[in-house]
């Protein structure tokens, strides 16, 4: 579910459409790692990690830069970055020429919609639906490389991520 990730009003509408609690941050979607660097300040190791796993099914939590609003991060000083390995999403991000909220097109607490037909009415009423075909339905692995236990949510490639971070 995408909206302008720098516009607090647009971000609020995403929270409303999803019924998502405002204390649960949204991720910021961009077309590539270089675009992400405008919005986050990774360490050298964190940037190497990004380049190793993005694009891919990973959300990397990093220190945010000033343009990223509190509304997106629930006031936290870190933001999740998504560069999906999905050509329709990447084309949308490139065309938007701005960071976009990166969250699943479902109501909070419901399973991810893998096909456009599974997108709930409340989401359809709040947004334009782009049909990029069926998605794998596997959640991204959420990683904060700065933590001792960096995997915050296990998803695709979790074992490879842990191995890279240990190495």
Please give the residue ranges for each predicted region.
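Active-site-adjacent structural elements in enzyme catalytic cores
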Residues: 1-167
